[in-house]
């Protein structure tokens, strides 16, 4: 499952959504750096956490809306259920994931809320430093 998710994840779009209005304020180099950080963050924290807490994953349904899709799954772990939906779109002829919705909460929008608060309180540079440090902690 991890390979399927990582291999089909649109980290740039996820990063754009997560950074919101601050994305356009960043240079191309900063955008690429942030996308790399978000890739590491997603792989090392979110996906690892999901995989650790997953005994069985059930694919419940798909909703196709033109060039977008929503794939609904249920992850079971030690008797508890977590609903994980994958928001997907066609990019370059391939279906790619750009967001995960865990028990009704969008990961990208939750990131955006936290990132806006951090940038407003400190700075974009501090957000990047913290994300890098937290990603290194999990390796």
Predicted regions and their residues:
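Juxtamembrane/interface motifs at transmembrane-helix termini
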Residues: 20-22, 51-57, 117-119
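Alpha-helix boundary/capping detector
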Residues: 31, 49, 60-64, 121, ...
């Amino acid at each position: 499952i991890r390979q399927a998710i990582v291999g089909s994840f649109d980290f740039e779009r996820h990063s754009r959504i997560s950074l919101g209005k601050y994305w356009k304020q960043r240079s191309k180099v900063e955008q690429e750096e942030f996308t790399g950080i978000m890739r590491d963050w997603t792989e090392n924290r979110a996906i690892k956490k999901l995989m650790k807490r997953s005994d069985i994953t059930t694919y419940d349904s798909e909703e196709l809306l033109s060039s977008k899709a929503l794939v609904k799954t249920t992850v079971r772990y030690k008797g508890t259920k977590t609903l994980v939906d994958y928001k997907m779109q066609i990019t370059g002829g391939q279906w790619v994931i750009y967001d995960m919705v865990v028990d009704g909460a969008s990961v990208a929008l939750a990131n955006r809320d936290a990132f806006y608060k951090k940038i407003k309180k400190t700075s974009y540079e501090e957000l990047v430093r913290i994300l890098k440090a937290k990603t290194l902690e999990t390796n």
